């Protein structure tokens, strides 16, 4: 175990000089004891570069307040490691695997795995394609999720990415009883706190491990916390043979943290000021999220889109790895349609007749073509009004509006705000409901009856409450 001395401190980046034959390897964890007002604190550093002359450049996982030149640094001889296995369920951790909830500390005998590792080899990968039912109509019908796939939730600020993730955690735990790992990467501490207490109240927390590196933490923690969460998920997949869900909120903050330290590490910035290693860092994370012959890790990642610009290098780097995208659209939130998922922009490679079946595929495509036709007619309606449309076009518009409203539904996790009970709709009921709308079976029911309901039975009940004969 080598000993070194701090030679330079630049915010979250610290240079350390070691003896000639004791220079630590890249990704090794180093430990510094720092004197602060509250006493002596252990600060963990991760080796990022070897600069030559026995100096390494490191990234701090916590605040560097109190670190001085000449402070002694110890090489741990290994990379950062986090606890894995059943002991992590129901607990909240930081990037280093230390518990940050109010319960007692984990036993030191709990197994720990290093956060840096290779992706599974080709011969270990599974090629089986299976749909993951979410109970959310717009997703299950138009952009279904694949077990062991990677799904991106794209949207600007405040369009509902985190609420959608919370609903997915709730639905999958309640309906499928699956294990989830939640990695909070650079998001609001309040949201993490709310999520923890909501999950505790619903009992879902017993099946979930949570890892947080929030907005107020240094970029080193935000950059590595996704790997900490992934390592916990990999153990459930590889050792216990489980199908695990890994939620990352928000993957953009992972990139943002990398760009914050990149310049301090001495790298030349690339497009829009991002780090030149953007594609490599993203690939190293995403390639580990996969299905193997032992089990699967299905990843659902919220992706913040800066200024709603999908060509920005950060969201573009994520796109390349995804099996399905769920695009959230601000215009839909303005119309009061929740979840505000854009039915035309959201995609999935699972929307294929050989995977979902011919009926589901045809109804999904008919729904999309009806909505597309409605979108094309909106300019004419805005200028000339509905009266100028042909009878066929009027019928298309009326059905499209019913479809648009029927794609919305109440969420379980939003019950406390809306006062409405949440809905879980099985795929079969979703497909039957949209088929009935396309066939004109419900043309006599006012479109308001389709807003924020679950199955078609709820539409009929709502219409009766409105005094309509069904």
From Swiss-Prot:
User: Pfam families attached here?
Assistant: ATP-synt_ab, ATP-synt_ab_N, ATP-synt_VA_C
What catalytic activity is recorded? ATP + H2O + 4 H(+)(in) = ADP + phosphate + 5 H(+)(out)
Example GO molecular function term? Answer: ATP hydrolysis activity
Q: Is Translocase tagged as a keyword?
A: yes
For whether the record's keyword set contains Mitochondrion, the answer is no
Q: Which HAMAP family has this protein been placed in?
A: ATP_synth_beta_bact (MF_01347)
Which residue windows are coiled coil?
none
Gene Ontology cellular-component terms for this entry are:
plasma membrane; proton-transporting ATP synthase complex
Q: Note the InterPro entries from the entry.
A: AAA+_ATPase, ATP-synt_VA_C, ATP_synth_F1_bsu, ATPase_a/bsu_AS, ATPase_alpha/beta_chains, ATPase_F1/V1/A1_a/bsu_N, ATPase_F1/V1/A1_a/bsu_N_sf, ATPase_F1/V1/A1_a/bsu_nucl-bd
Membrane topology designation: Peripheral membrane protein
Query: What's the family?
Result: Belongs to the ATPase alpha/beta chains family.
Instruction: Write the Enzyme Commission number(s) for this entry.
Output: 7.1.2.2
Uppermost EC category: translocase
Residues that bind ATP: 155-162
Q: What does this protein do?
A: Produces ATP from ADP in the presence of a proton gradient across the membrane. The catalytic sites are hosted primarily by the beta subunits.
Subcellular location as annotated: Cell membrane
State what protein this is by name. ATP synthase subunit beta
């Amino acid at each position: 175990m080598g000993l070194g001395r701090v030679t330079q401190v630049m915010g979250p980046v610290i240079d350390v000089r070691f003896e000639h034959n004791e220079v630590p390897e890249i990704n090794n964890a180093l430990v510094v004891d720092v004197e602060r007002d509250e006493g002596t604190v252990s600060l963990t550093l991760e080796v990022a570069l070897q600069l030559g002359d026995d100096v390494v450049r490191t990234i701090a996982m916590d605040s560097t307040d109190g670190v001085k030149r000449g402070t002694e640094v110890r090489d741990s001889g290994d990379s950062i490691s986090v606890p894995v296995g059943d002991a992590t369920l129901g607990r909240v951790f930081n990037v280093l695997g230390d518990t940050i909830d109010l319960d007692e500390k984990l036993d030191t005998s709990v197994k720990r795995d290093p956060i840096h590792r290779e992706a599974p080899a080709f011969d270990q990968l599974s090629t089986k394609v299976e749909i993951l039912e979410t109970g959310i109509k717009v997703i299950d019908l138009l952009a279904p999720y694949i077990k062991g796939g990677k799904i991106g939730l794209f949207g600007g600020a405040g369009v509902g990415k985190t609420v959608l993730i919370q609903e997915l955690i709730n639905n999958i735990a309640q309906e499928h009883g699956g294990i989830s790992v939640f990695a909070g990467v650079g998001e609001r501490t309040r949201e993490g706190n709310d999520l923890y207490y909501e999950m505790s109240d619903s009992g879902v927390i017993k099946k979930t491990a949570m890892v947080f590196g929030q907005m107020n933490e240094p970029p080193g923690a935000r950059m590595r916390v996704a790997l900490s969460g992934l390592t916990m998920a990999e153990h459930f997949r590889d050792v216990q043979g489980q199908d695990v869900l890994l939620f990352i909120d928000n993957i953009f903050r992972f990139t943002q943290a990398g760009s914050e330290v990149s310049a301090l590490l001495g790298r030349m910035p690339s497009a829009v000021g991002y780090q030149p290693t953007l594609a490599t860092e993203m690939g190293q994370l995403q390639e580990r999220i996969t299905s193997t012959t032992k089990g699967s890790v299905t990843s659902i990642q919220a992706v913040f889109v800066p200024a709603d610009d999908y060509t920005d290098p950060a969201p573009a780097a994520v796109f390349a790895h995804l099996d399905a995208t769920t695009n959230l659209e601000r215009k839909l939130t303005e119309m009061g349609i929740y979840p505000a998922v854009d039915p035309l922009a959201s995609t999935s490679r699972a929307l294929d007749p050989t995977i979902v079946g011919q009926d589901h595929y045809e109804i999904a495509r008919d729904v999309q073509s009806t909505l597309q036709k409605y979108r094309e007619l909106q300019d004419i309606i805005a200028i000339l009004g509905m009266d100028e449309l042909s009878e066929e076009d009027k019928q298309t518009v009326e059905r499209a509006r019913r479809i648009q409203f029927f794609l919305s539904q109440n969420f379980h996790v939003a019950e406390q705000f809306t006062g409405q009970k949440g809905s879980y709709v099985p795929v079969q009921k979703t497909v039957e409901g949209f088929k009935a709308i396309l066939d004109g079976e419900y043309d006599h029911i006012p479109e308001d009856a389709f807003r924020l309901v679950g199955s078609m039975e709820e539409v009929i009940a709502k219409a009766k409450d409105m005094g309509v004969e069904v």
